[in-house]
Amino acid sequence: MTEQALLSELDRLVSEERNPRTMDIDLLSSLAIVRRINDEDHLVPAAVEQVLPQVAQAVDKVVDAFRVGGRLIYLGAGTSGRLGVLDASECPPTFSVPEGMVIGLIAGGVDALQHAIEGAEDDPSLGESDLRNIGLTSHDVVVGIAVSGRTPYVIGGLAYAESIGATTVALSCNPDSTIATMAEIAISPVVGPEILTGSTRLKSGTAQKLVLNMLTTASMIRIGKTYENLMVDVSATNNKLVARASRIVMQATGCGAGEAKRVLALTDNEVKLAILITITGMPVDEARKALKNAGGFLRQAINANKA
């Protein structure tokens, strides 16, 4: 693409427009600057609210994928890629899902998490090759993340995903973007011009983070990773999380700290199992079987085995 063509393309993007509400921001005090930023940030949840039906559609597709052994895969460059990697990396400790069930891919690879990798996002073939390298299948869901909706790395990845029958989702912050027209589901929260012109790590990045939070959290809730609003599948891998596990058992059952600690010791810190045993009085082996019979849904296991 020529420089003139690129300039023309950027001129059409809402995310590249100048914000009339922040034209004087370089004249303001520190407090006034952060107030102005905060004012703009208030626009983000409203923009996300407009696309909740599309987010819910994507959640349903992710749940369907998980149920047949498929994966959720994020694909992005720069800030968009980093946000995908961040969200994916939180899933194993939060929900005790295996590494690789949710994957974040970023143009330029791991080095791009800390450093700008020049040109990595400009090659559509790299998006395809990164998906090939993880063995993408038709059971997977690929979420292409790009504020502009025109990042070649993401376009190439989504095109490949579509070609093999994987579910495709586009997350951008410009209406009718290139990736939005490509994907099966388009999620396009339009937050308007940034506080600093073109700095899409700001409002656009915040909108993306909110949507990614929803995709994984809602999907994990739907496959039984919570009980009420408690993270009952949390992996107790450090002192803080061991304490959290005890607290969750106490909150779910009303038992004391000593009892929670005792039952967690019996279950090797499996919170779901500890709660089921505490509420029903079942032996460990029977409780484990009951939980399996309920498909991992703790509420169902409790209801089926209450005295």
Curated annotation (Swiss-Prot):
CDD domains membership: SIS_Etherase
Transmembrane segments: none
Superkingdom, taxonomy of origin: Bacteria
Keyword entries, A-Z: Carbohydrate metabolism, Lyase
Residue stretches making up the SIS domain: 62-225
Pfam families documented for this protein: GKRP_SIS_N
GO biological process, one term: 1,6-anhydro-N-acetyl-beta-muramic acid catabolic process
EC category name: lyase
Subunit structure: Homodimer.
Note: A lyase-type mechanism (elimination/hydration) is suggested for the cleavage of the lactyl ether bond of MurNAc 6-phosphate, with the formation of an alpha,beta-unsaturated aldehyde intermediate with (E)-stereochemistry, followed by the syn addition of water to give product.
Protein name as catalogued: N-acetylmuramic acid 6-phosphate etherase
Organism: Brucella anthropi (strain ATCC 49188 / DSM 6882 / CCUG 24695 / JCM 21032 / LMG 3331 / NBRC 15819 / NCTC 12168 / Alc 37)
